[in-house]
Curated annotation (Swiss-Prot):
The gene is anapc3. TPR repeats lie at residues 35-68, 74-107, 142-175, 185-218, 319-353, 361-394, 546-580, 636-671, 672-705, 740-773, 775-807, 808-841, 843-876, 878-910, 911-944. Keywords: Cell cycle, Cell division, Mitosis, Nucleus, Repeat, TPR repeat, Ubl conjugation pathway. Residues 424-443 have a biased composition (Polar residues). The APC/C is composed of at least 13 subunits that stay tightly associated throughout the cell cycle: anapc1, anapc2, anapc3, anapc4, anapc5, anapc6, anapc7, anapc8, anapc10, anapc11, cdc20, cdc26 and cdh1. PANTHER family: CELL DIVISION CYCLE 16,23,27 (PTHR12558), CELL DIVISION CYCLE PROTEIN 27 HOMOLOG (PTHR12558:SF13). It holds the Pfam family ANAPC3. Component of the anaphase promoting complex/cyclosome (APC/C), a cell cycle-regulated E3 ubiquitin-protein ligase complex that controls progression through mitosis and the G1 phase of the cell cycle. SUPFAM superfamilies: TPR-like (SSF48452). Pathway: Protein modification; protein ubiquitination. This is Anaphase-promoting complex subunit 3. GO terms for cellular component: anaphase-promoting complex; cytoplasm. It comes from Dictyostelium discoideum. Residues 446-460, 570-580 have a biased composition (Basic residues). GO terms for biological process: anaphase-promoting complex-dependent catabolic process; cell division; metaphase/anaphase transition of mitotic cell cycle; protein ubiquitination.
Length: 970
């Protein structure tokens, strides 16, 4: 029931039925109240946007230990502004991953540490309390390097958290469902956001870098990193393919070692068991021959005794390696491929279990039998070696199967892969007591009867059908069937994987003619226990959960004491159950279970192409890994270009950023996100026409994109495009009223109409929707500045800096306030601070030069800064005019006239140009040119006619105050 409910919850979420998923998750938690099911309820509430409900659900739990619940608790607190509570939860996750997900750098050290851990377990358990009470002491006497000492000091601060982890028996179980690279990276990312909010810059940089190192595709973490320190980022280090593989292997190194150790352990077990079977082969043959004339009851006892003998050989004669570590066990762990957790989420190892592949494999087998009739089928055995570590990932393998009426009404026992039934006509070739039977590897679930010759099935199952039978058994076993025998009990290398190797008809006929004996009877435990365990396991769909091995259950099953008794009862029942059925019934059951009969109703499985099936030991897996490697390389190359371009834009190297974005392919470049960043770069370069055309293209290409439109509205405000600004304000306000970008656009529209009060209300509405929207605070500050509310403007700009320390517009706004208040030293400081962030800003250089002019000791520095502003942006008319005014004040009239004439070519209708030109010509004695310039100014600006006429009247006279009013000419 629990498996069905979990699958139903996942399907409901996938179909957008959130309320139905919430109802099912509540039923699931009522049935089984654990942290895993609690996470499902809280996660659904969080996805619905009900953060308060999510927080209360998690807080009501008496004790939260699982990492995914701690992460969701911290995320909810962060969204609600509870920064301290969020940090207390997320720090546990960070310490856990930093402490327990760091494999040693040396394999030799790993082996030595494993041996030392086995010898020091008792001492560590006895010293847990001492470690908690004495947190300042070094717990590891072997740490002699400075890095290890610093690590001990770091963990000593959080000794209480480490003590909580020490009390947990299975430390790896608390990260179940949340141990993928993306999950670990998201934990570090949230810790970086919290540190940034607390103004802990170094700590924020540390965790944001760890986030990108752990999972390079976590783009939001890289964006935050660029907002803090773009000059400290090494793109080649963060988005290197070698670094990605290193990080993935770094996270999974311990799991790989356990995997290899367990493979070696099973290999040693199989090799020694094979030797024992060879030594006892003659005795077994004699016992089997003597038992051929016995009754069915004696026959069953012989089979049972053989099973018990095989089990004893395995459990008593196998040798464990010294460095074998029993891996951590979690009841919900599933079997999966483990080259790395990243590959687990990308590759699905699928067995051949479809009709097309069965027919093709059958034809190939018949051809091989005709070409090599005498060769034993050892290749088929070798082909499927080491396949027991692969979970069948069929399209519907995670869905509880729908059984037929026969299976749903009766107690179902799994049908063996190859079942020999007694011949109704009796034995035609009685066995000879003097004949010797060659050794044959045993197969699971196969009973060769000693009383008579094995019956030849009408349809010989090829290896593909055997695989399909085993896989169908693995997923068709009812959940109510609860067998507790071990999962794997092996006697040879052929039966450990759960696959059967049958002898062809030609080989059996040759053996009947020459030797007239039956094959050796060696049986193993049924694979039913493995099927039941895999059926009962859960499949969690969480934040990037990867599938892992249930190695503890595999290793511990080899030494269970109650194995013999349970296997004895099961083999008895299993043997008698199939002896009571005819051959036709067994074939019908096999066809019904395989669903390959022509007239049967086919289940709604997805069609799989056989070319997509990956062989674990063949070339297909190698080719698949190569394709995966190519895909990762291509994705990292794309991320490298995007990251490099975005970093350049954050450094306000706009020309370089535009060229870097052009390295993208046409498909990637013609996207809304990229074009928005390119338009922003042109806007910073004061190329308003190009930026406007790009924004218009984005608005038509992706009308749903609102991010970046706030900058588009500011551009229209600067260009005084009232009609277009009103149009997009109406458009986006109707499209999404819950978006802060929509309200910023509307606010700019009212600001252009000089309705500053309405604009302030709209900007504050945007801040309510997104308290971290830096640009809304900045625009709100400018509106307060327009209303001469300087204190409110200062508060708004400071809030913007708090959200983004590199937002130079906020520093520029504070500098304007201090400049208006004639606090030139403070104004200079903030202008320089803004200029240190954006060194290519012509406006900042201009205002800094204006500020320096008021310092008598820095007048020349001010002039140089204005020249720099014009050099950065030659069309910056405001800088040209201010430079001309400075030159006029310093009696450099010819240079001032040159700047004014350049300004006149760009903006020929600006009145201040002609007024200042008239003053310059007057000082040079060229009164005719001065009169012409002043008359032109009078024609362009009749409103200031009184001031201009007074200048005309004073042309023949010397005016001592002419040098004092040039700043009024704006």
């Amino acid at each position: 029931m629990e498996e069905i409910m979990i699958q139903s919850i996942d399907e409901s979420i996938h179909c957008g039925l959130i309320k139905n998923a919430l109802f099912l998750s509540e039923r699931l938690y009522a049935s089984t109240a654990n942290e895993d099911n609690l996470f499902k309820i809280a996660q659904i509430y969080y996805q619905m946007g009900k953060i308060n409900q999510c927080l209360l659900i998690l807080q009501q739990h008496p004790q939260i230990t699982m990492i995914k619940n701690l992460y969701l608790l911290a995320l909810s607190n962060y969204d609600l502004g509870n920064i301290q509570e969020a940090e207390s939860s997320i720090i546990k996750c960070c310490i856990y991953f930093e402490k327990y997900f760091q494999p040693n750098n040396n394999n030799n050290n790993n082996n030595n540490n494993n041996n030392n851990n086995n010898n020091n377990n008792n001492n560590n358990n006895n010293n847990n309390k001492d470690k908690c009470n004495n947190s300042n002491k070094n717990n590891d006497s072997n740490n002699n390097s400075n890095s290890n000492n610093n690590e001990n000091e770091y963990y000593g601060i959080y000794s209480d958290i480490l003590c909580e982890f020490d009390d947990i028996v299975d430390i790896n179980s608390i990260s179940y469902g949340f141990d993928s690279p993306c999950s670990i990276g998201s934990v570090y990312y949230l810790m970086g956001l919290i540190s940034k909010r607390k103004n802990q810059k170094e700590k924020a940089i540390k965790y944001l870098k760890k986030s990108v190192y752990t999972y390079p595709f976590l783009w939001v973490a890289f964006e935050q990193l660029c907002n803090i320190c773009p000059d400290e980022i090494d793109i080649s280090d963060l988005f290197s393919h070698t670094n990605l593989i290193h990080q993935i292997n770094h996270l999974n190194q311990q799991q790989h070692q356990q995997h290899q150790q367990f493979q070696q352990y099973l290999s040693n077990s199989l090799n020694q068991n094979k030797v024992n079977n060879n030594n006892n082969n003659n005795n077994n043959n004699n016992n089997n021959i003597n038992n051929n004339n016995s009754s069915n009851k004696n026959n069953e006892q012989t089979i049972t005794s053989t099973v018990a003998t095989g089990t004893t050989n395995i459990t008593t004669n196998t040798i464990k390696p010294n460095n074998f570590i029993k891996p951590p066990y979690h009841p919900n762990h599933r079997v999966g491929l483990t080259p790395s957790s990243f590959y687990d989420s990308s590759i699905h190892i699928t067995p051949i279990n479809f009709k097309a592949s069965i027919q093709q494999t059958n034809q190939q087998q018949q051809q091989q039998q005709q070409q090599q009739p005498q060769q034993p089928s050892q290749q088929n055995l070798q082909k499927y070696n080491n396949r027991y570590f692969v979970t069948p990932q069929t399209p519907l393998s995670h869905i509880t199967p729908i059984l037929s009426n026969r299976f749903s009404q009766n107690v179902v026992d799994p049908i063996p892969m190859v079942m020999d039934t007694p011949d109704s006509k009796g034995s035609q070739h009685p066995p000879s007591s003097n004949s010797q039977t060659p050794y044959t590897p045993s197969t699971p679930g196969v009973h060769h009867h000693q009383k008579q010759q094995p019956h030849q099935h009408k349809k010989s199952a090829p290896p593909s059908q055997m695989i399909k039978k085993s896989m169908s058994n693995e997923f068709d076993t009812p959940m109510s069937l609860d067998l507790k025998s071990p999962i794997f009990t092996t006697s040879t290398s052929s039966d450990v994987h759960g696959f059967t190797s049958s002898t062809s008809k030609q080989q059996q006929q040759q053996q009947q003619t020459k030797q007239q004996t039956t094959t050796t009877t060696t049986t193993t435990t049924s694979i039913t226990d493995k099927e039941v365990l895999l059926t009962k396991t859960k499949k969690q769909v969480n934040f990037g959960k990867t599938e892992e091995f249930s190695l503890k259950s595999l290793s511990s099953s080899l030494s269970d004491d109650d194995y013999d008794e349970e296997n004895h009862h099961y083999q008895q029942h299993h043997h008698l159950h199939h002896h009571n059925k005819s051959i036709d019934e067994l074939e019908l059951e096999e066809d019904d279970q395989l669903n390959i009969t022509d007239n049967s109703v086919q289940p709604n499985f997805y069609e799989f192409d056989e070319s997509s099936i990956l062989d674990f030991n063949g070339g297909d897996l190698y080719e698949g890994l190569i394709e995966l490697h190519k895909g990762q390389t291509q994705l990292l190359e794309l991320f490298f270009i995007l990251a490099d371009s975005y970093r350049l834009l954050c450094l306000y190297l706009c020309k370089e950023a535009i060229e870097s974005f052009k390295r993208l392919s046409e498909e990637q470049y013609r996207t809304g996100w990229v074009l928005t960043k390119v338009a922003k770069a042109y806007h910073e370069l004061i190329d308003y026409k190009e930026a406007r055309s790009i924004f218009q293209e984005v608005s038509q290409m992706e009308p749903y994109r609102l991010e970046g439109m706030e900058l588009y509205s500011t551009l229209l405000w600067q260009m005084n495009e009232d009609a277009e600004l009103s149009y997009i304000a109406h458009k986006y306000s109707e499209f999404d009223r819950l978006s802060p970008y929509s309200w910023v656009v509307v606010g700019n529209c009212f600001s252009l109409q000089r309705d500053h009060e309405a604009a302030i209300k709209l900007f504050r509405r945007a801040i309510q929707l997104d308290p971290d929207m830096t640009y809304a605070y900045t625009l709100c500050g400018h509106e307060y500045l327009a209303n001469d509310e300087l204190e409110l403007a200062l508060n708004a700009f400071r809030m913007a800096i708090r959200c983004d320390p590199r937002h130079y517009n906020a520093f520029y706004g504070i500098g304007l306030i201090y400049y208006r208040q004639e606090k030139y030293n403070l104004a200079e400081y903030h202008f320089r601070k803004a200029l240190s962030i954006n060194e290519s800003s012509s406006v900042l250089c201009c205002y800094l030069g204006m500020t320096l002019q008021h310092n008598p000791n820095k007048i020349q520095d001010g002039i140089d800064m204005l020249y720099r502003s014009i050099e950065i942006q030659p069309k910056n008319t405001f800088a040209k005019f201010k430079l001309a005014a400075f030159l006029f004040a310093n009696q450099q009239y010819h240079h001032a006239i040159d700047q004014l004439l350049e300004f006149k070519e760009i903006e020929p209708k600006e009145t201040p140009i002609y007024i200042l030109l008239g003053k310059c010509y007057k000082q040079l004695g060229e009164l005719d040119k001065a009169l012409d310039s002043l008359n032109t100014a009078l024609d362009l600006d009749p409103k200031n006619s009184n001031y201009i006429r007074s200048l005309i009247d004073k042309l023949p006279l010397e005016d001592e105050d002419d040098n004092q009013d040039y700043f009024q000419l704006n």
